[in-house]
């Protein structure tokens, strides 16, 4: 009787191992990154391989997915594009200067979601959505376009420099906030090509 129990237990263990091991050997869905992006409301991991095609292979996106650093933050060519993307995708709810309308203001140091003080958190909110009318924008903006939009939002910031955690010390010293009427030239040199017109 004891041998039958041992054999049964061993067979059960082998069966479970046979089921579990192939599942463990399967590749994970989506690209593996150094940063885990989480839904702003639920905390669930976001699959950044989903959404609008393109805009995932730029050096800036690769760096951001690995480190959470947005290389576009102070690049004039990316600010130019971010302004246009923000105007079409965000300003209807957040205001032309991110001062807030139906949605909260994004240009001061009060954040409805504290995670949005970081570029990783703001990216996750744009990508996966939040409460209320803030739906996910991963179907109408690529990750590269999201980074350009974030750069523009950060450029509109009017709060104290010390609260701008997305800027490093060198960037804080050089930071010049947006001045109404400021125009960034279409031919501004930098990492971002002009958007298709």
Curated annotation (Swiss-Prot):
The organism's superkingdom is given as Bacteria
What Gene Ontology molecular function terms does this protein carry?
A: electron transfer activity; heme binding; iron ion binding
Tell whether Electron transport is among the UniProt keywords: yes
Q: Does the keyword NAD apply?
A: no
Signal sequence coordinates: 1-25
Q: Name one GO biological process term.
A: methanol metabolic process
Compartments reported by the entry: Periplasm
Question: Which residues bind heme c per the record?
Answer: 90, 93-94
Which keywords label this protein? Electron transport, Heme, Iron, Metal-binding, Methanol utilization, Periplasm, Signal, Transport
Any Gene Ontology CC annotation: periplasmic space
Modifications made to the protein after synthesis: Binds 1 heme c group covalently per subunit.
Spell out the InterPro entries in the cross-references.
Cyt_c-like_dom, Cyt_c-like_dom_sf, Cyt_cL
What is the recorded function of this protein according to its Swiss-Prot or TrEMBL entry?
A: Electron acceptor for MDH. Acts in methanol oxidation.
Q: What is this protein called?
A: Cytochrome c-L
The record lists the organism as Methylorubrum extorquens (strain ATCC 14718 / DSM 1338 / JCM 2805 / NCIMB 9133 / AM1)
């Amino acid at each position: 009787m004891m041998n039958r129990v041992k054999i049964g237990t061993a067979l059960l263990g082998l069966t479970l191992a046979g089921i579990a091991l192939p599942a463990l050997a399967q590749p994970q869905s989506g690209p593996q990154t150094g940063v885990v992006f989480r839904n702003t409301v639920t905390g669930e991991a976001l699959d950044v391989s989903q959404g609008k095609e393109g805009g995932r292979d730029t050096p800036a996106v690769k760096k951001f997915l690995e480190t959470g650093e947005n290389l576009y933050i102070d690049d004039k060519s990316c600010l130019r594009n971010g302004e246009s993307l923000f105007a079409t995708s965000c300003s209807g709810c957040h205001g032309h200067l991110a001062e807030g309308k139906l949605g909260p203001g994004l240009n001061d140091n009060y954040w409805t979601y504290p995670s949005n003080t970081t570029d990783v958190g703001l990216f996750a909110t744009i990508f996966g959505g939040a409460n209320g009318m803030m739906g996910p924008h991963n179907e109408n903006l690529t990750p590269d376009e999201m980074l350009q939009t974030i750069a523009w939002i950060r450029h509109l910031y009017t709060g104290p420099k010390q609260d701008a955690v997305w800027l490093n010390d060198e960037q804080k010293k050089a930071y010049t906030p947006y001045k109404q009427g400021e125009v960034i030239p279409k031919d501004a040199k930098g990492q971002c090509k002009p958007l298709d017109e």
